[in-house]
Design a protein with these regions (language model features):
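Short, well-structured alpha-helical segments that form the helix of a local strand-helix-strand
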Residues: 213-230
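Solvent-exposed, acidic/polar segments of extracytosolic/periplasmic ligand-binding ectodomains
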Residues: 225, 229-285
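Extracellular/periplasmic periplasmic-binding protein-like sensory domains
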Residues: 124-196, 207-212, 260-284
Length: 285
């Protein structure tokens, strides 16, 4: 409407670049679709067949569940989803939710809650034995913003997407992390990576455009290559989604502190649809 270029940094909604995508909007973070596919790839290796899901009842949670189901069923046609819980965001009744999931006798759980809801879910689930002898796959839970506040109560062995901020040993991340610690005297979080890479992307786009004209900036952002602390990324011309990835691993508690272990970096571009398919999902101009 306003015809102003917009680089969305934190939002995860698939609609932003697909069903409601437009010429002016670009997105940095790996989307719900991308991260759900990353987790489904690991979930498919589990023996679990009976799955339940728990997610906040709004677009993010709904699309996270829908994408995970579709991706896992494609890899493992034998699995079945036997129950769903949809707590209101920020208002989870954790005891009720946990009991409802227990009644379904699942082999595994897919969790999309985060923040205060996650802490309540973890506490009640642990008290009531929900996680005993069950696999849990959990979106975003390895991000330090959500994992560190759990402290020694953090669950162990969950398969998560996240950011093992103190374990990555690459030149590009070392350079960023050292500068960040020197500037702020604290460890970087996912938000730190996102904020830094957003600013680098905008600067690169302005430099390439050579002006602040909206059309020139859009043209510059389409196909733009940027160096991030996770390595080089590209903003795809087809849908304006960047190829920034995420780390996938398991949760653990080491010396009383939660952390990610057994992790690997999942390149964002490997978990996106083809360019033609993405373009077809966008509204016609």
């Amino acid at each position: 409407k306003e015809q102003v270029p917009f680089l969305a940094s934190e939002p995860l909604s698939d609609a932003m670049v697909w069903s409601k995508g437009n010429d002016y909007t670009f997105r940095l973070r790996p989307s719900t679709y991308m991260q759900a596919k990353m987790l489904a790839e690991e979930a498919a290796k589990l023996p679990a067949k009976r799955w339940v899901t728990v997610a906040p009842n709004y677009e993010y949670g709904q699309s996270a569940v829908e994408n995970f189901k579709a991706a896992l069923k494609e890899l493992r046609p034998d699995v079945e989803f036997v129950g769903e819980q949809w707590p209101a965001l920020g208002k989870i009744e954790a005891g009720v939710t946990v009991q409802a999931l227990l009644r379904e006798r699942p082999d595994a759980i897919y969790n999309v809650t985060f923040g205060a809801d996650l802490a309540k879910f973890v506490r009640e689930g642990s008290l009531r034995g929900l996680f005993d002898d069950r696999s849990v796959v959990s979106l975003l839970t390895g991000e330090p913003e959500y994992l560190l506040p759990l402290g020694a109560e953090a669950p162990e062995g969950w398969i998560v997407t996240g950011y093992p901020f103190d374990q990555i040993d690459t030149p590009e991340h070392d350079k960023f992390a050292e500068a960040y610690r020197a500037s702020f005297n604290e460890e970087p979080m996912v938000g730190s990576i996102v904020g830094y890479t957003t600013m680098k992307s905008i600067a690169a786009a302005l430099d390439k455009a050579g002006s602040t004209d909206a059309g020139a900036i859009i043209e510059a952002l389409s196909g733009l290559e940027v160096d991030s602390p996770f390595g080089p990324i590209v903003y795809r011309s087809a849908d304006h989604q960047s190829t920034l990835g995420a780390f996938v691993g398991r949760t653990a508690v080491v010396d009383g502190q939660p952390r990610m272990v057994d992790w690997h970096y999942a390149k964002g571009g490997d978990y996106l649809t083809g360019g033609d398919e993405a373009a077809a999902m966008r509204p016609a101009n």
